[in-house]
Amino acid sequence: MLKTKSSIILFILFFLACLLFFFKPLLYHFHSEKILAPDQMQSLVDNASQSLLANDVPVGAILIYNDSILSTGINTVYRDSNAGGHAEINAISNAIHKIGFEAFSKLDKQKLMLVSSFEPCMMCRGAIIEYNIRKVYFLKGKGLLHWWKNDLKQVRYEWSKVKVNGDEVQDSLFMLHPKYKSQ
């Protein structure tokens, strides 16, 4: 009897984990929608339009701090031949250029939000996570199939990466940096 109950519980937990894995890209549907101020929406549309005028994918992003636009970004991948020239990354970079890295690092991240006209890709998500931007909003989401394909790419990456020898070389370079803190 006890074995049957624990098997049922394990099955239910496994089933819930599978549901979470397969539908995690759609979790934003469970949050309420954010209403942008008219000037913020206009800035977002203007930035996406600028990308389009440069023959780039029409995506714009704004970084908002304390309800004011801190910086904007447009998609510049084709215009600048820059693989990292996504609107979200450009908005983050422009904010850092505007106020400096130290000041950006000290911003209250609870008052900082990134808004994009299109759901951020994996690369932009990485930048969002790296810079501890906790609030992310977007106008149009990507489909479930898109994220499933990305999950497969992530698995392929994890299986294909190989560490090479030379830890001490990178460690010595880190130690030369004035802000390096040994771990």
Functional labels for PLM-detected ranges:
Residues V77-N90:
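A short, polar/charged loop-to-alpha-helix boundary motif
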Residues Q40, L44, A87, A91-K98:
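Stable alpha-helical structural segments in soluble proteins, enriched in small hydrophobic residues
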Residues N82, I92-K106:
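A contiguous binding-surface segment within folded domains or other stable secondary-structure elements
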Residues V59-D67:
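Short beta-strand scaffold segments in enzyme catalytic cores
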Residues L70-V77:
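Short beta->alpha transition motifs characteristic of CBS
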Residues S105-F118:
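Immediate flanking context of iron-sulfur cluster ligation sites
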